[in-house]
């Protein structure tokens, strides 16, 4: 998905049980922090989420790396509306216990489908996540 997650909804999702899921890991973005890449990692009952950097779409192009590898990466992930922002989380689990359809539905319910109608209004959404980065004075 390309749309951002609602911060409260995805935070609640991260703190719920995921029956049959053994491991998950991936990247995400939330409407209240459009410049930052969030990372989620789960093993068993332990779930960790943190900021790991900025999306390239928020970095001035004169600071982008040069070369065919980076260009190929941008070609693969770039979207005219969202840049390189995306939701990309992988779930690994027991086939007999993990309900992939349910996980997808629960994640889809966390997306802000009409984000592009007024992005600024969603930047001020309630955000229960801890601070990811401190500003250096």
Residue positions per predicted region:
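P-loop NTP-binding site
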Residues: 1-137
């Amino acid at each position: 998905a390309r749309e951002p997650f609602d911060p409260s909804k995805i935070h609640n999702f991260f703190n719920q049980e995921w029956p049959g899921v053994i491991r998950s890991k991936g990247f995400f973005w939330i409407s209240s922090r459009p410049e930052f890449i969030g990372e989620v990692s789960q093993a068993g009952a332990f779930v960790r989420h943190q900021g790991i950097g900025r999306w390239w779409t928020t970095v001035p192009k004169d600071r982008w790396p040069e070369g065919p590898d980076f260009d190929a990466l941008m070609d693969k992930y770039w979207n005219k509306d969202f840049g390189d922002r995306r939701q990309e989380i992988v779930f690994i689990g027991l086939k007999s216990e993990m309900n992939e359809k349910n996980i997808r539905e629960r994640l889809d319910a966390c997306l802000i489908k009409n984000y592009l109608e007024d992005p600024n209004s969603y930047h001020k959404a309630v955000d229960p996540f801890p601070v990811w980065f401190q500003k250096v004075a």
